[in-house]
C-alpha cells in the first residue's frame, strides 16, 4: 500500500523540493479606463454596486475595501469603459485602497511599522478572529496551513491563544456581540502586535455594513496595520501580503 502511494505521488509530478518562493494568483478588480474621457458619469455602475464601492460624483473612483469583486459594474457600463485589471495585494492604510483615474492601482510595496517588523522578526504567530463572517475567509485561512500553501515554511503559524500571537488576523464585519471579545483578544496579546483586516467585510463591513455591526469594518474598533482586500482573498495572497508587509521580499 505504501509503495502504491509513493508511485502515485511520483506519477503526479509534484515538486520533491520545498518551494521557497510564492507567487499569488491575480485578483482582478474593476477599473474605468477614463484616460480618453469615455466615461460619461452616467452612474449606472454605481447604481448596480451592492456595496457602494463606486463613486462618480467627482472623479470615477473605486474603493477596493468595499468591492466584493462581483463585476456587475462591468456589464452595466453602456460605453464598456470598465475593465478587469490586477488588484494590489494589500495596503497599509485605508486610503490606500481608493483608486481613480488620477490614482490608478499599483503593486503594493509598503511595509508595516519598521520597529514592529524588526522585533517580530521572521517568526510570525497568528491568532485568527472571526467577528461574524460568512466563513469564506475562514476556509482560506484553513488552507494556508495545508501542504500546498504551507505557510510554516515562511515561519508563520496559527496559534490558539492571543497570548502567544504576534498578529491578529481579523475577518468579518465586527458584529456588535463580537466587539467586546475582539477588544479582549487584542488586549491579551503581547506588544508589539499587528492587526490585519482580511477581506472586504473586515475592511469596510461589506454587504453586512447596514446590519447589526459596530461601524464600517474593524477599523472603528481596532487600530489596523494592514488591509488585505478580497471576497475572500486567496491563501497565497494572504501569505504573500504578510511576507511583503513585514519586509520579507
Where are these regions (language model features)?
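Ferredoxin-type iron-sulfur electron-transfer modules in oxidoreductases and energy-metabolism complexes
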Residues: 52-61, 190-191, 195, 213-214, ...
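Iron-sulfur cluster-binding cysteine motifs and their immediate structural context
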Residues: 34, 43-91
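Flanking helices and flexible, charged tails adjoining ferredoxin-like Fe-S electron-transfer domains
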Residues: 1, 12-15, 19, 74-162
Amino acid at each position: 500500500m505504501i509503495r502504491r502511494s509513493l508511485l502515485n505521488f511520483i506519477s503526479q509530478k509534484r515538486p520533491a523540493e520545498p518551494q521557497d518562493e510564492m507567487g499569488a494568483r491575480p485578483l482582478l478588480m474593476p477599473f474605468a479606463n477614463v484616460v480618453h474621457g469615455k466615461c460619461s458619469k452616467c452612474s449606472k455602475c454605481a447604481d448596480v454596486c451592492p456595496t457602494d464601492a463606486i463613486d462618480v460624483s467627482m472623479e470615477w473612483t473605486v474603493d477596493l475595501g468595499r468591492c466584493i469583486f462581483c463585476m456587475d459594474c462591468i456589464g452595466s457600463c453602456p460605453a464598456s469603459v470598465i475593465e478587469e485589471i490586477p488588484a494590489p495585494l494589500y495596503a497599509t492604510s485605508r486610503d490606500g485602497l481608493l483608486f481613480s483615474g488620477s490614482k490608478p492601482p499599483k503593486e503594493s510595496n509598503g511595509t508595516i511599522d519598521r520597529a514592529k517588523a524588526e522585533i517580530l522578526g521572521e517568526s510570525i504567530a497568528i491568532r485568527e478572529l472571526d467577528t461574524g463572517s460568512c466563513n469564506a475567509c475562514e476556509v482560506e485561512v484553513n488552507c494556508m496551513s495545508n501542504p500546498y500553501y504551507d505557510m510554516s515554511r515562511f515561519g508563520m503559524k496559527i496559534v490558539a491563544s492571543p497570548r502567544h500571537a504576534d498578529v491578529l488576523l481579523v475577518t468579518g464585519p465586527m458584529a456588535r456581540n463580537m466587539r467586546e471579545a475582539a477588544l479582549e483578544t487584542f488586549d491579551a496579546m503581547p506588544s508589539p502586535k499587528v492587526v490585519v483586516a482580511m477581506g472586504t467585510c473586515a475592511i469596510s463591513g461589506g454587504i453586512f455594513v447596514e446590519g447589526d455591526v459596530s461601524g464600517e469594518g474593524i477599523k472603528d474598533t481596532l487600530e489596523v496595520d494592514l488591509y488585505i482586500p478580497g471576497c475572500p482573498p486567496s491563501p497565497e495572497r494572504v501569505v504573500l501580503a504578510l511576507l511583503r508587509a513585514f519586509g520579507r521580499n
